Protein backbone atom coordinates (compact mmCIF):
# COMPACT_ATOMS: atom_id res chain seq x y z
CA UNK A 1 0.00 0.00 0.00
CA UNK A 2 2.82 2.41 0.81
CA UNK A 3 4.45 1.66 -2.54
CA UNK A 4 1.25 2.46 -4.43
CA UNK A 5 0.76 5.69 -2.48
CA UNK A 6 4.36 6.76 -3.15
CA UNK A 7 4.06 5.88 -6.83
CA UNK A 8 0.78 7.78 -7.16
CA UNK A 9 2.16 10.83 -5.33
CA UNK A 10 5.31 10.94 -7.46
CA UNK A 11 3.35 10.52 -10.68
CA UNK A 12 0.89 13.27 -9.78
CA UNK A 13 3.68 15.60 -8.70
CA UNK A 14 5.59 15.00 -11.95
CA UNK A 15 2.47 15.57 -14.04
CA UNK A 16 1.70 18.75 -12.11
CA UNK A 17 5.20 20.13 -12.67
CA UNK A 18 5.17 19.27 -16.38
CA UNK A 19 1.75 20.89 -16.78
CA UNK A 20 2.84 24.05 -14.98
CA UNK A 21 6.02 24.30 -17.07
CA UNK A 22 4.05 23.78 -20.28
CA UNK A 23 1.31 26.28 -19.58
CA UNK A 24 3.36 29.08 -18.06
CA UNK A 25 4.22 31.57 -20.79
CA UNK A 26 7.80 32.56 -21.36
CA UNK A 27 7.98 36.24 -20.44
CA UNK A 28 10.12 39.02 -21.91
CA UNK A 29 11.15 37.34 -25.14
CA UNK A 30 12.63 39.84 -27.55
CA UNK A 31 15.36 39.80 -30.19
CA UNK A 32 18.16 41.17 -28.00
CA UNK A 33 17.62 38.45 -25.44
CA UNK A 34 17.64 35.60 -27.95
CA UNK A 35 20.58 36.84 -30.03
CA UNK A 36 24.07 35.39 -29.45
CA UNK A 37 26.42 37.41 -27.26
CA UNK A 38 30.13 37.51 -28.07
CA UNK A 39 31.96 39.77 -25.57
CA UNK A 40 29.89 42.82 -26.45
CA UNK A 41 30.79 42.70 -30.16
CA UNK A 42 28.75 41.62 -33.11
CA UNK A 43 29.32 37.92 -33.76
CA UNK A 44 32.02 37.19 -36.33
CA UNK A 45 30.23 34.16 -37.70
CA UNK A 46 27.05 32.20 -37.31
CA UNK A 47 26.22 31.18 -33.77
CA UNK A 48 24.43 28.11 -35.07
CA UNK A 49 27.01 25.60 -36.23
CA UNK A 50 25.84 22.90 -38.62
CA UNK A 51 25.36 19.57 -36.89
CA UNK A 52 26.11 16.32 -38.64
CA UNK A 53 23.19 13.94 -38.37
CA UNK A 54 25.48 11.04 -39.24
CA UNK A 55 27.68 11.86 -36.24
CA UNK A 56 24.58 11.95 -34.02
CA UNK A 57 23.43 8.52 -35.21
CA UNK A 58 26.88 6.98 -34.73
CA UNK A 59 27.09 8.51 -31.24
CA UNK A 60 23.67 7.13 -30.25
CA UNK A 61 24.62 3.72 -31.63
CA UNK A 62 27.83 3.80 -29.60
CA UNK A 63 25.91 4.68 -26.44
CA UNK A 64 23.45 1.83 -26.97
CA UNK A 65 26.20 -0.73 -27.52
CA UNK A 66 28.11 0.65 -24.54
CA UNK A 67 25.03 0.23 -22.36
CA UNK A 68 24.54 -3.35 -23.51
CA UNK A 69 28.19 -4.15 -22.78
CA UNK A 70 27.80 -2.58 -19.33
CA UNK A 71 25.03 -5.11 -18.69
CA UNK A 72 27.58 -7.89 -19.23
CA UNK A 73 30.06 -6.57 -16.67
CA UNK A 74 28.46 -8.05 -13.51
CA UNK A 75 28.22 -11.54 -15.03
CA UNK A 76 31.50 -12.86 -13.55
CA UNK A 77 30.10 -12.20 -10.08
CA UNK A 78 26.81 -13.81 -11.10
CA UNK A 79 28.69 -16.98 -12.01
CA UNK A 80 29.13 -17.60 -8.28
CA UNK A 81 25.36 -17.86 -7.85
CA UNK A 82 23.54 -21.12 -7.35
CA UNK A 83 21.76 -21.10 -10.70
CA UNK A 84 24.52 -21.05 -13.30
CA UNK A 85 22.18 -21.91 -16.19
CA UNK A 86 20.19 -18.69 -15.78
CA UNK A 87 23.38 -16.61 -15.81
CA UNK A 88 24.71 -18.35 -18.92
CA UNK A 89 21.37 -18.01 -20.69
CA UNK A 90 21.24 -14.30 -19.86
CA UNK A 91 24.80 -13.82 -21.10
CA UNK A 92 24.01 -15.70 -24.31
CA UNK A 93 20.90 -13.59 -24.89
CA UNK A 94 22.77 -10.33 -24.33
CA UNK A 95 25.64 -11.32 -26.61
CA UNK A 96 23.17 -12.53 -29.25
CA UNK A 97 21.32 -9.23 -29.02
CA UNK A 98 24.61 -7.38 -29.47
CA UNK A 99 25.55 -9.48 -32.50
CA UNK A 100 22.13 -9.17 -34.15
CA UNK A 101 21.95 -5.43 -33.60
CA UNK A 102 25.49 -4.97 -34.92
CA UNK A 103 24.61 -6.98 -38.04
CA UNK A 104 21.47 -4.88 -38.51
CA UNK A 105 23.38 -1.61 -38.15
CA UNK A 106 26.00 -2.87 -40.57
CA UNK A 107 23.40 -3.97 -43.15
CA UNK A 108 21.61 -0.61 -42.92
CA UNK A 109 24.94 1.19 -43.43
CA UNK A 110 24.56 2.88 -40.06
CA UNK A 111 28.25 2.51 -39.24
CA UNK A 112 29.60 4.15 -42.39
CA UNK A 113 30.78 7.70 -41.87
CA UNK A 114 30.62 8.82 -45.51
CA UNK A 115 27.37 8.96 -47.38
Curated annotation (Swiss-Prot):
Gene Ontology, cellular component aspect: mitochondrial inner membrane; NADH dehydrogenase complex
Keyword Transcription attributed: no
Chief location of this protein within or outside the cell: mitochondrion
Superkingdom of origin: Eukaryota
Catalysed conversion reaction: a ubiquinone + NADH + 5 H(+)(in) = a ubiquinol + NAD(+) + 4 H(+)(out)
Chain segments annotated as transmembrane: 3-23, 55-75, 84-104
Keyword Metal-binding: no
Gene3D superfamilies from the UniProt entry: NADH:ubiquinone/plastoquinone oxidoreductase, chain 3
GO molecular function, one term: NADH dehydrogenase (ubiquinone) activity
UniProt-listed PANTHER family: NADH-UBIQUINONE OXIDOREDUCTASE CHAIN 3 (PTHR11058:SF9)
Biological function: Core subunit of the mitochondrial membrane respiratory chain NADH dehydrogenase (Complex I) which catalyzes electron transfer from NADH through the respiratory chain, using ubiquinone as an electron acceptor. Essential for the catalytic activity of complex I.
Membership in a protein family: Belongs to the complex I subunit 3 family.
This protein's name: NADH-ubiquinone oxidoreductase chain 3
Species name: Rhinolophus pumilus (Horseshoe bat)
Lineage: Eukaryota, Metazoa, Chordata, Craniata, Vertebrata
Gene designation: MT-ND3
